Amino acid sequence: MELVLKDAQSALEVSETTFGRDFNEALVHQVVVAYAANARQGTRAQKTRAEVTGSGKKPWRQKGTGRARAGSVKGPIWRGGGVTFAAKTQDHSQKVNKKMYRGALKSILSELVRQERLVVVESFGVEAPKTKELKAKLKAMNLEDVLIVTAEVDENLFLAARNLYKVDVRDVAGLDPVSLIAFNTVLVTADAVKQIEEMLA
């Protein structure tokens, strides 16, 4: 299959297994959920009545004082006592096989092509790290909510895009399923397309 280059009167020959496969919604959902879960820190922690510092002594005798009976100052109804169902540190990470991860990326890329949200250009960059220059370039292409994917890290492009709302720059190595579905349009250079094919082969 071919992808038409927006800035040149030519097309790029690409693999149909990477850019022309059926959309597997269940797989994409599983990988995106796992990716989000793996980003969770999970370091919250509270103390139960067993872990709170304090005496184990009964505060006052069981009968005769007129007060409600109490067996510990560490109970959850006491100020400074433990938490009834205390939150504990958790590992939320989910295992994602390489085959699943690659399959999800291929599925997303194919769907972007079908929806005409994948824009391929011969090359893309800015001469200086100026937001104004990049904004003008994107406006000329009628692009606003866009992820720019380059073959290598382009520092000028990264710095120029840093202050733009709904614009992000990634190299192929930093590509992930969540960033691909987070933007309306994905702008990819021809070199990046070749690298993506090699990575997902």
Curated annotation (Swiss-Prot):
**GO BP terms in the entry:** translation
Instruction: Explain the purpose of this protein.
Output: One of the primary rRNA binding proteins, this protein initially binds near the 5'-end of the 23S rRNA. It is important during the early stages of 50S assembly. It makes multiple contacts with different domains of the 23S rRNA in the assembled 50S subunit and ribosome. Forms part of the polypeptide exit tunnel.
Keyword S-adenosyl-L-methionine carried by entry: no
List the keywords (alphabetical).
Answer: Ribonucleoprotein, Ribosomal protein, RNA-binding, rRNA-binding
The source organism is: Shewanella baltica (strain OS155 / ATCC BAA-1091)
Homology family: Belongs to the universal ribosomal protein uL4 family.
Pfam families of this UniProt entry? Ribosomal_L4
Q: Name one GO molecular function term.
A: structural constituent of ribosome
- Put simply, this protein is called Large ribosomal subunit protein uL4
The record ties this protein, via PANTHER family, to: 50S RIBOSOMAL PROTEIN L4, LARGE RIBOSOMAL SUBUNIT PROTEIN UL4M
Annotated stretches, region: Disordered: 45-72
Complexes and interactors: Part of the 50S ribosomal subunit.
What the entry lists under InterPro entries is as follows:
Ribosomal_uL4 (IPR002136), Ribosomal_uL4-like (IPR013005), Ribosomal_uL4_dom_sf (IPR023574)
Q: What is the lineage of its organism?
A: Bacteria, Pseudomonadati, Pseudomonadota, Gammaproteobacteria, Alteromonadales
Q: Which branch of life, at top level?
A: Bacteria
Provide the Gene Ontology terms for cellular component.
Answer: ribonucleoprotein complex; ribosome
User: Which gene does this sequence derive from?
Assistant: rplD
